[in-house]
């Protein structure tokens, strides 16, 4: 999205004219300790490890995108110790003027908290207080150990407009089955911690409505209402997104 999108009807921006972005979503890498059932190797190194160790999934005739048959090497063009020209270009742009012109930067993954560049970004806000008034938003599975959540809470104190997005749509064993790697008690503890201590301007729950969550989805929404009563009506906001792919996990198959 650019700052010309809000122009009055009939205004036209010449194709050769430079424009400033209003929002930007980036992913530094796909490192992630979860292998959620509706995710795939393009967004999770845990999925990559599974397919490397156990081989491709066979006879998934309804997976039209073939996500589970290969490791999506094109999603990680550079190794973790290699210089990445795309990330270098981002930092050059960020330092020059992007931090002044953006309204929101949203960092996804993988799991952003496992990326060194995410912590570099947090440190930039600490070292450059007042230089940017933008919203910083991250997607996190909030499955990290105490030390990682401690670090997140500490770094978040230096971001004036910090928004955190996390994902879940079921409770207890059902949630752990759908989102492989999640420990329900750890996740709920971390949710409480970031809501109480994390200097959040916004906390958002993304629910992926799929065939495996329907029997406890309403219980999960009750949990969200309990959070609202504890931390305020907007903690969390939540969205209900109908899963379409992989189609064998769509609620429409039931």
Where are these regions (language model features)?
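Alpha-helical packing segments of well-folded alpha/beta enzyme cores
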Residues: 24, 90-93, 121, 187-190, ...
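Distinct, well-ordered alpha-helical segments
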Residues: 119-123, 146-155, 216-218
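Catalytic cores of alpha/beta
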Residues: 211-227
């Amino acid at each position: 999205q650019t700052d010309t999108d809000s122009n009055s009807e009939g205004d036209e921006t010449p194709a050769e004219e430079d424009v400033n972005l209003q929002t930007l979503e980036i992913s530094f890498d796909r490192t992630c300790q979860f292998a959620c059932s509706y995710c795939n190797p393009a967004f999770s190194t845990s999925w990559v490890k599974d397919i490397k160790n156990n081989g491709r999934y066979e006879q998934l005739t309804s997976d039209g995108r073939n996500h589970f048959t290969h490791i999506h090497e094109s999603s990680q063009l550079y190794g973790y110790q290699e210089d990445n020209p795309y990330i270098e270009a981002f930092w050059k742009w960020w330092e020059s003027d992007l931090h002044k012109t953006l309204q929101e930067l949203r960092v996804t993954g993988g799991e952003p908290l496992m990326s060194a560049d995410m912590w570099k970004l947090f440190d930039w806000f600490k070292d450059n207080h007042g230089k940017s008034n933008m919203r910083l938003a991250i997607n996190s599975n909030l499955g990290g150990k105490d030390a990682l959540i401690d670090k997140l809470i500490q770094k978040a104190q230096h971001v004036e407009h910090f928004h955190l997005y996390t994902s879940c749509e079921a409770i207890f064993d059902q949630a752990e089955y759908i989102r492989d790697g999640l420990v329900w008690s750890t996740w709920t503890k971390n949710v409480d911690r970031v809501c109480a201590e994390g200097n959040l301007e916004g906390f958002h729950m993304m629910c992926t409505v799929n065939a495996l969550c329907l029997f406890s989805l309403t219980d999960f929404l009750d949990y969200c209402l309990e959070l609202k009563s504890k931390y305020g009506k907007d903690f969390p906001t939540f969205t209900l997104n109908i899963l379409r792919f992989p189609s064998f996990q769509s609620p429409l198959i039931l």
